Each structure stands twice: as structure tokens, then as C-alpha cells.
């Protein structure tokens, strides 16, 4: 219970951080509203429009549907209204008969009424005939419509059947075309594979030829060395070298293709025959110092490698020196450019100062001239 301005108010449940006050009416009081909401800021709101404006201006408050403008009590109903609702009027089963009016018509009125009745009967007959004709026409129209719809449906079915048949034919044609295309693609792929196999075989034949040529050159060199040497060459060493070369050739051929085995056997037989012939010749010629020649070749190769490494190191040092010189030159050029720019800036500043001084002198001279003219004018006016 709260007492504000001698008015009794009752606090009712309200949304969070809000207050709902109920002011019961009193006779002779000017207050119209019974319920007043008090906002968290202390503002009193007594109408829905005011509440909407406040909620729009202050977001974060509860929804307007949470604010109830009733006290929460069911209103009392008078006994008179409840009795009226309970009392149900009985519905009459038959309409009450109206009182017949006494007719005080003359004979003429009776004749006119009879004529009117006859005309009405004739009109009714005409209407019946028209209704029958219209019904027949409507039935005929309905039959015609049904026949047209049946014909249209039959045509649609025929068209659909033709479409389905055409689609089937097209699909079958597409399948046959796809099968033909697939067969052509397979044939092309097989041709490509055959061409690749032929190329691989040609490459393998070239490799074998190169190996044969290298072997023949090696054998000729060995024969020359054996002829120029002091003693007779041992046949076992020569045969060992040739056997290693032949094994390398055999490995290359086996990796390339298995079909070339007969050719490899022929080359091996030829190589063995040549080795036997060369062995017999070398036995007669003498044994050369192959180890000494190999060591001499290794020494030459090591010397050449050392010379190349020293040259590369010297070139690297020269490159580093050149890059350092270029960097120093670039730094010197930058310093010279900065000095030149500073000199230009100072010259420009001096020129600006001179121009400003000249402008100031010109303005001073013009002011002095104006003052002199004003003084002369004042003196002339005084003399006048």
C-alpha cells in the first residue's frame, strides 16, 4: 500500500524493474485511468501510446505484450443479464397464420384478377417450354463438349505414343552410334599402342647398335694398345672386360623388351667369337701394362678437376669484388646526389628570400607614395 497525494494505490504484479499501480475510482475525482505503470527511470505512464513511445525511445525493456492494463479480476455480471442469457425463447415449429383481410372488391376487380391469373398461367407455361428447350440445348452442348474432349484425349494419347516411339528410336540410334564410336576409339587406341610398341622396338634396336659399335671401338683400341705394348696381353683380362660390356648390353635389352632375346643370343655368340679371335691374336702380340695406363688417366682427370675448381673459385672471388665495387660506386653516387639536392634546395630558399625582400620593398614604396599623395591632397584642400 502506497499513499501518494492522499490517493490510495495498490501495487500489482508487473514486468521486471517496472511497477504497476492500481488507483480505485472515487466519486468526484478527476482521475480517469485506474492503472499506471512506473518505468525504471521513475516516469509514470498512463496510456498505451505513451508506453509505445517510451519503449521505442528506451530499448532493452520488456515487450509491450507483457504489459496488461487490467487488474486481473474477472468482472462481475449482473443477475439480470445472466437471467436473460438463461431464458431461451422457444422456436415455433409452424409459422403463425396471418389474419385474412376482408375484401370489399367489386365484380370488375374480380374480373381483372382472373385475367391477371390467366396471363400469369400462360407466362408460366411459356417459361416451362423455354426451360425445357434450354435444358435440351445444354444437354446437347454437354454431349458435344464430352465428344470433343474424348477426341482431344485420344489425339493426346496418339501423340504421346508417337513421341515415346520416336524417343525409343532416337535412343537406340544413339546407343548404336555410341557403340560405333566406342569401337573406333578402341581401334585407335590399339593403333596408338602398336605405334608406341614399334617406336620402343626401334629405340631398343638403336641402343643395341650403339652398344655394338662401342664394343667394336673398345676392342680395336685394346688391340692397338696390345700391339704397342712390350709384353703379350693376358687373354683372361681382355675377356673379362669384354664380358662386362656384353653384360651391360644384355641388361639394356632385357629391360626394353623380352621379344629381342634371339637377337641378344646372336650378338652374344658374335661377341664370344670376336673375343676368342682377339684373345688368340693378343696372346701372340704380347701383354700391355693396362694398370699403368688406367692410373695415368686417373691422374690426368684429377689434375683437370683441380684446375677447374681453382678457376671456379677465382671467378667467384672476381665476381664478389666486382659486386663490392659496384655497391661502393652506387653509395658514392647517392651521396653526391643528396649533396647536389641539398645545394639546390639552399639556392632555391635564398632565391625565395630575395624575392620576398623585393616584394616587401615594393609594397613599402607604394605605401610611402600613397601617403605622400594623401598629404599633398590634404595640403591642397587646406590652401583652398
Curated annotation (Swiss-Prot):
MBD domain boundaries: 4-74
Keyword Coiled coil part of the UniProt annotation: yes
Compositional bias (Low complexity): 369-384
GO terms, molecular function: methyl-CpG binding
Record keywords: Coiled coil, DNA-binding, Nucleus, Phosphoprotein, Transcription, Transcription regulation
Positions in coiled-coil regions: 100-224, 310-356
Cellular component terms (Gene Ontology): cytosol; nucleus
Broad class of where this protein is predominantly found: nucleus
Database matches in InterPro entries: DNA-bd_dom_sf, MBD10/11, Methyl_CpG_DNA-bd
Pfam family of the protein (one): MBD
Tissue-wise expression: Expressed in leaves, buds, flowers, stems and siliques.
Domain of life: Eukaryota
This protein's record includes keyword Protein biosynthesis: no
Phosphoserine carried by residues: 323
Subcellular location: Nucleus
Disruption phenotype: Impaired nucleolar dominance.
Domain comment, as recorded: The methyl-CpG-binding domain (MBD) functions both in binding to methylated DNA and in protein interactions.
Function in brief: Probable transcriptional regulator. Required for nucleolar dominance that consist in the silencing of rRNA genes inherited from one progenitor in genetic hybrids.
Protein name: Methyl-CpG-binding domain-containing protein 10
Source species: Arabidopsis thaliana
UniProt lineage: Eukaryota, Viridiplantae, Streptophyta, Embryophyta, Tracheophyta
Gene that encodes it: MBD10
Amino acid at each position: 500500500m502506497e499513499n501518494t497525494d492522499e490517493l490510495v494505490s495498490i501495487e500489482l504484479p508487473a514486468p521486471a524493474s517496472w511497477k504497476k499501480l492500481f488507483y480505485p475510482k472515487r466519486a468526484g475525482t478527476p482521475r480517469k485511468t485506474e492503472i499506471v505503470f512506473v518505468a525504471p527511470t521513475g516516469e509514470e505512464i498512463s496510456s498505451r501510446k505513451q508506453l509505445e513511445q517510451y519503449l521505442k525511445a528506451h530499448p532493452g525493456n520488456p515487450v509491450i505484450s507483457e504489459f496488461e492494463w487490467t487488474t486481473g479480476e474477472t468482472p462481475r455480471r449482473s443477475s439480470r443479464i445472466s437471467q436473460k442469457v438463461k431464458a431461451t425463447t422457444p422456436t415455433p415449429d409452424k409459422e403463425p397464420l396471418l389474419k385474412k383481410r376482408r375484401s370489399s372488391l367489386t365484380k370488375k376487380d374480380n374480373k381483372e384478377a382472373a385475367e391477371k391469373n390467366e396471363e400469369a398461367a400462360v407466362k408460366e407455361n411459356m417459361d416451362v417450354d423455354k426451360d425445357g428447350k434450354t435444358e435440351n440445348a445444354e444437354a446437347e452442348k454437354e454431349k458435344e463438349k464430352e465428344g470433343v474432349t474424348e477426341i482431344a484425349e485420344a489425339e493426346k494419347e496418339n501423340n504421346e505414343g508417337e513421341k515415346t516411339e520416336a524417343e525409343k528410336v532416337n535412343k537406340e540410334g544413339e546407343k548404336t552410334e555410341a557403340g560405333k564410336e566406342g569401337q573406333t576409339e578402341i581401334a585407335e587406341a590399339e593403333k596408338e599402342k602398336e605405334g608406341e610398341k614399334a617406336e620402343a622396338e626401334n629405340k631398343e634396336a638403336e641402343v643395341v647398335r650403339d652398344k655394338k659399335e662401342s664394343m667394336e671401338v673398345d676392342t680395336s683400341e685394346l688391340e692397338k694398345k696390345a700391339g704397342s705394348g712390350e709384353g703379350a696381353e693376358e687373354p683372361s683380362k681382355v675377356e673379362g672386360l669384354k664380358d662386362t660390356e656384353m653384360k651391360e648390353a644384355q641388361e639394356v635389352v632385357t629391360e626394353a623388351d623380352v621379344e629381342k632375346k634371339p637377337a641378344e643370343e646372336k650378338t652374344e655368340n658374335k661377341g664370344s667369337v670376336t673375343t676368342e679371335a682377339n684373345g688368340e691374336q693378343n696372346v701372340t702380340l704380347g701383354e700391355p701394362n693396362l694398370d699403368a695406363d688406367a692410373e695415368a688417366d686417373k691422374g690426368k682427370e684429377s689434375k683437370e678437376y683441380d684446375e677447374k675448381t681453382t678457376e671456379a673459385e677465382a671467378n667467384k672471388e672476381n665476381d664478389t669484388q666486382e659486386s663490392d665495387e659496384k655497391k661502393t660506386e652506387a653509395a658514392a653516387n647517392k651521396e653526391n646526389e643528396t649533396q647536389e639536392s641539398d645545394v639546390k634546395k639552399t639556392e632555391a630558399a635564398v632565391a625565395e628570400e630575395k624575392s620576398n625582400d623585393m616584394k616587401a620593398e615594393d609594397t613599402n614604396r607604394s605605401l610611402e607614395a600613397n601617403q605622400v599623395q594623401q598629404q599633398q591632397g590634404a595640403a591642397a584642400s587646406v590652401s583652398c
